[in-house]
Amino acid sequence: SITKIKAREIL
């Protein structure tokens, strides 16, 4: 999922 990866990047 891209959303999970994006959330990881933000955090």
From Swiss-Prot:
Pathway terms, separated by semicolons: Carbohydrate degradation; glycolysis; pyruvate from D-glyceraldehyde 3-phosphate: step 4/5
EC nos: 4.2.1.11
GO CC, alphabetical: cytoplasm
Record flagged with keyword Lyase: yes
Cofactor(s) for this UniProt protein: Mg(2+)
Co-factor binding comment: Mg(2+) is required for catalysis and for stabilizing the dimer.
Localization per Swiss-Prot or TrEMBL: Cytoplasm
Catalytic activity, reaction form: (2R)-2-phosphoglycerate = phosphoenolpyruvate + H2O
Similarity section: Belongs to the enolase family.
UniProt subunit comment: Dimer.
This protein's name: Beta-enolase
